Amino acid sequence: VSDGYSYMISLGYDEVAKICLTHSFNIQTTDVYIGNFDTTQEELKMIQDTLETVVMDEYDRLIQLCDSIAGPEGVLDIEDRMNDVRQRYGAYPKEKWDSNLELKKHFEEKTGKNIYTVVGKDVFKP
């Protein structure tokens, strides 16, 4: 997360850098991060400070939704994906779980369609 962000900033790709952070933090805090913090304290502070000030837009939310339904074998049911993450990391914060379900609902309302139909869940295989 921080390496991608810093690298994209160094190249002048601020919007891409933003996505490097926001895709992992649909709740703008590190408190519900799932995974291991393999960053220095300085990098962690940079992530936290940036998350406090970043303004997320529809593109950020769309990338977050895609991240919450993507698996190595294709598109997964969002709850199956979250359960897979829970099994691998031992926990999945309810706040993040609920936020992912809200993202799904948000884009289903925007498109007027089931999100799995939109992304071709039953037909797309990598």
Placement of each model-derived feature along the sequence:
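An active-site-proximal "capping" alpha-helix that borders the catalytic cofactor pocket
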Residues: V1-G12
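Divalent metal-dependent phosphate-bond-processing catalytic cores, especially two-metal-ion Mg2+/Mn2+ enzymes
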Residues: S10-Y13, D31-V32, N36-P126
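Acidic/histidine metal-binding catalytic segments
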Residues: G12-S24
